[in-house]
């Protein structure tokens, strides 16, 4: 089996043989802290259907008092396995590790040392009638029931947290929650694979190509547990990812990467079906059909028990999971008004708040020092301590919304999110590349979308797992291309604070029958802006085009994600794109810019620009260069804080 890449969505903790130390507050914490202060026990907990889930329990050696349980359920392994092998760090953060918690990690059903069959984002079952009717909610319930009744020195209170996929399981835990579950923190949580991670508004994220096998490779012996990685990630023969995917052509040509000739998995007999069942799902379900809808979790957050407090955490520049946490927070808030439900929205990439790195940057952009450390000590620890160790009332001392203004670079607190005082304001994509509050005469702005020369999503030439830094990348390189339309304000005479979602209301046409539409919101910095010392050598902050938010819509889904339809050639058509929330001030002396384009490669796959029923089955001959038009009565609806 090929070398396994140890990154896996921020989920596997690297274990080092070399003893190091980490500064926490005024103390030094060594990598042997966990082994010195905790006992470790591994158990296989039986679920209601008899399947056992492998669970690792770290309990404080000081048994003179009771402790709450904090748990994480993961598909990425609760390693290291074995009684004498300890993680170097446990719990959500080092403060909680030191403060005294019973910390539990569990391999979810069908993964690693747990029995059973794994389903990628297992669908919720609202009608459990027999002990064979299970889902992730019932597995969490059964696990908590066992823990509170069998783990010594627990105080009867349980919390759950997780980042990315473990965040999905944290959200799942609040559906049909166990009475002992008092606090849950879904962080960068997956909610629906059609809008996060592998798709954005129906466009397939080609940048996730190498991650597919992580979820779609069957275990060698079916449902039999295994303690080593059984999957490999596709090796690309070049460092130039852009050129590689351009040369590969249609998506159907990538099937060969999911035929695991060296793996101990049975070959599937059906022609055109690979060994990777997730790749097969992606290919066979190009639309938001019943399969994808059933796996979504947002629709099941309408009846969250008020006994569970939730703190949703999202990174403002999370390239992987931004839709998930924001929609999780908003839907719990909408349907469970009496619940304790808070949002933390900070200047991080995927899971950046869990790392302690002093200087807080995303890509080349610097936001300040100690931001993640502040979150861990004064927000996250405070939340769990209050609901698991304190009286658990709603007076936690934390605000409803703890949000970071990524323009002013400071924290703000609000009683609601979006905050009171937000008004909707349209800005128009006006002639002569202007962005104005008042509409002007309607004109047509055309550009050629050359299928052989798609717009890159980044200047970097590299092969990456899932790109992150592009979320704050300098967009000058794109602004200077002929197939990227640019609309820009004059220099701001006063601050403009954007707080909430953004709606791009485009009016477009195409000579073809299919097209993607990408909108980017950009903060253009002044010419005298000083450079941050950690920037890439070829970049300067002078005139830096900071991408504040961006989004794509696969045009076939402009009216329905379940029922796609072609464009009528040369017919003016409305295309509305929802961009995720921002909290960013375009400061005085800066400019606000909007870029519109139709390719974003290889972040997303290429649209053939001629309509086919399934792009995963498109032929080379389907791909055509087209001319696209944006009409200047198009507008961008901003949420402006006054």
What are these language model-derived features?
Residues 14-16:
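C-terminal motif of bacterial Sec signal peptides marking the signal peptidase cleavage site
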Residues 28-63, 488-494, 567:
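N-terminal cap/lid segment of alpha/beta-hydrolase-fold proteins
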Residues 65-149, 198-199, 356-367, 513, ...:
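Cap/lid segment of the alpha/beta-hydrolase catalytic domain
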Residues 86-89, 98, 120-123, 130-133, ...:
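Accessory cap/linker subdomain of secreted extracellular hydrolases
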Residues 152-164:
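Alpha/beta-hydrolase fold nucleophile elbow
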Residues 232-236, 243-264, 358-642:
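C-terminal, loop-rich substrate-recognition/catalytic regions characterized by aromatic stacking residues
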Residues 312-314:
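Short beta-strand/loop motif that positions the catalytic acidic residue
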Residues 319-326:
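Conserved alpha/beta-hydrolase "acid-adjacent" motif
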